[in-house]
């Protein structure tokens, strides 16, 4: 487990700063956000310090979503499992420009009980240029072929 001495989340993991811990595994720590945007807003963090998602080892990342899934069950989010029912957002930001405040990878689990609560998202979609999209697709497939055999 890599940690950083001045990182607030690393201090929470070590117990140097108190938290409202919910689930802890060998590689993941989850707790209630102390500045929530909705009731039961939870943070889920890897126990490996890294500022951005690509800095976290895969074995730590693969532990996170099962914890998120368990939390959705405990929080009883959309128990009836219908598109019309309440829902939730799972949010993860990388870098200041993408609204990351703490330089330790973290996932927000934000309940969305109704239109007035939880995360509000505006999605400014662009018009689709299919020729441009096709060229990007080919370029990305070439890049993916190069990294398929590399350790990500």
Swiss-Prot record:
Instruction: Cite the EC number.
Output: 3.-.-.-
Residue numbers annotated as active site:
106 (tele-amp-histidine intermediate)
- Is the Hydrolase keyword given for this protein? yes
Which InterPro entries does the protein's record reference? HINT, Histidine_triad_CS, Histidine_triad_HIT, HIT-like, HIT-like_sf
Recorded catalytic reaction(s): these are: adenosine 5'-phosphoramidate + H2O = AMP + NH4(+)
Motif Histidine triad motif boundaries: 104-108
Q: Which residues form the signal peptide?
A: none
Any Pfam family matching the protein: HIT
- Kind of enzyme, top EC level? hydrolase
Q: Start and end of every HIT domain?
A: 8-119
Identify the keywords attached in UniProt to this record, alphabetized: Hydrolase, Magnesium, Nucleotide-binding
Biological processes per GO annotation:
nucleotide metabolic process
Where are the bilayer-spanning segments? Answer: none
- List the SUPFAM superfamilies hit by this protein, alphabetically: HIT-like
Residues reported to bind AMP: 33-34, 93, 99-101, 106-108
Q: Family assignment? A: Belongs to the HINT family.
Function noted in UniProt: Hydrolyzes adenosine 5'-monophosphoramidate substrates such as AMP-morpholidate, AMP-N-alanine methyl ester, AMP-alpha-acetyl lysine methyl ester and AMP-NH2.
Subunit: Homodimer.
Q: What is this protein called?
A: Adenosine 5'-monophosphoramidase HNT1
Species name: Candida albicans (strain SC5314 / ATCC MYA-2876) (Yeast)
């Amino acid at each position: 487990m890599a940690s950083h001495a001045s990182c607030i989340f690393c201090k929470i993991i070590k117990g140097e700063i108190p938290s409202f811990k919910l689930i802890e595994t060998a590689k993941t720590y989850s707790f209630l956000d102390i500045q929530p945007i909705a009731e039961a807003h939870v943070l889920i963090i890897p126990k490996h310090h890294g500022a951005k998602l690509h800095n976290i080892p895969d074995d730590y990342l693969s532990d996170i979503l099962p914890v998120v899934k368990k939390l959705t069950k405990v929080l009883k989010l959309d128990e009836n499992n219908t598109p019309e029912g309440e829902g939730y957002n799972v949010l993860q930001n990388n870098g200041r420009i993408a609204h990351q405040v703490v330089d330790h990878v973290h996932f927000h689990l934000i309940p969305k009980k109704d239109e007035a609560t939880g995360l509000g998202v505006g999605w400014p979609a662009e018009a689709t240029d299919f020729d441009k999209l096709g060229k990007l697709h080919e370029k990305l497939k070439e890049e993916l072929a190069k990294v398929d055999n590399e350790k990500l």
